[in-house]
Amino acid sequence: MQTLVNEHFPDRLLKVEEHGSSIIFHAHNGVMLAVEAVTNHVLRFRYSAKGYFSPDFSYAMADDHRSGFSYFKIEEKDDTYELKTPKLLCVVSKDSLKVSLYGEDGNLLNEDEKGFHWEEDSQRGDNIVKMSKRSFNGEHYFGLGDKASNLNMRDHRFQNWGTDEYGFAKDRDPLYRNIPFYYGLHKEGCYGIFFDNTYRTFFDFAKERKNVTSFWAEGGEINYYFIAGSSLMNVAQRYARLTGKPEMPPKWSLGYHQCKWSYSSEQEVMEIATKLRDLKIPTDAIYLDIDYMDGFRCFTWNNETFPDPKAMVNKLKEMGFKTVAIIDPGIKIDMDYWVCKEGFEKDFFCKHADGPLYKGKVWPGDCYCPDFTPAKVREWWSGLFNAGIDDGE
């Protein structure tokens, strides 16, 4: 990520404003940096090149992620401002808004290299927003979700963009699961960075330049949380409190699950289940892929190949199996299909920005996709599972 002709950077500091738990820095060219104390160990950094911040909203954060802090003090120095919690020191340069972060023992945990900068993208009508940081000698990096690479991500570049990549090989990227959170570990300590941006994002862990780690996005904001901790486990715990903890999984979900693409009939499913029991292979669940459906229509059964799903599920239950049936949120465009008709009439499907319904190719062919943004669509969708639950799923 070398410097490009149309890359832009913050100018020298113009003014500073205090807003409760946030300090806002304004540069002469309109760039803004908001530093927020989320907890004593967690700071949020939010940048804008537009002279204002868009409405603050995130799907990722837990409702109670702001769990309080003892204090957040600001002190002006000759060339910097120092922002302090009991556990962190954040130093902001007046020259460039670059940031350095220190632990409670004064050890340097993380610091900007170029810091925040952006590239104008006339094709998308938005900015490519970027952040580059110094990479310490011997620093290790972990995280990001599904990455078919080394555990330590140093010397690699990745992108996060959910992609259907069955049968992938080593170093294939991007893949299915994308989590814009990574750990940094070096001799001075450890930390985590959560990049809260829903655009296509990229992470370069000292790949292009050996002493620099960068992350950037094709739109939105540089909006990240810096999480300090005495250990990686400690950082993980604070990250979990920030974004929310999942429900405790049932014990059976931790066992062996039999899954493949795909079982074509009820008879085949029962043959597999019987064989697993005959061979005494401990198995807690068996999966039904798309072939159980009628023409790949969600929330339906193929009555020819799965003539009695309720009896099948109950028999599997007697044998000690949980039944897990796939549901893809791609709804076949067919007004004789009740899910499509209902979603269409209630205006629950995704649309293009200029109004027409979005159509995408999924297993049945052309499909509509539910717009899960409104709560009423999520409630409708969850209610569609009732018939399957009644069948014993």
Residues of each region from the PLM?
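Long, low-complexity, charge-dense
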Residues: I23
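Aromatic-lined carbohydrate-binding/catalytic grooves of carbohydrate-active enzymes
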Residues: E247-E393
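A low-complexity, Ser/Thr/Gly/Pro-enriched, surface-exposed linker/loop concept
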Residues: M1-V16, G20, E36-Y81
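Catalytic and substrate-binding clefts that recognize carbohydrates or anionic sugar/phosphate headgroups
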Residues: H26-H28, E36, R66-P250, K260-W261, ...
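Domain-wide signal for the mature, well-folded portions of proteins, strongly enriched
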Residues: F57-A62, T85-L88, H257
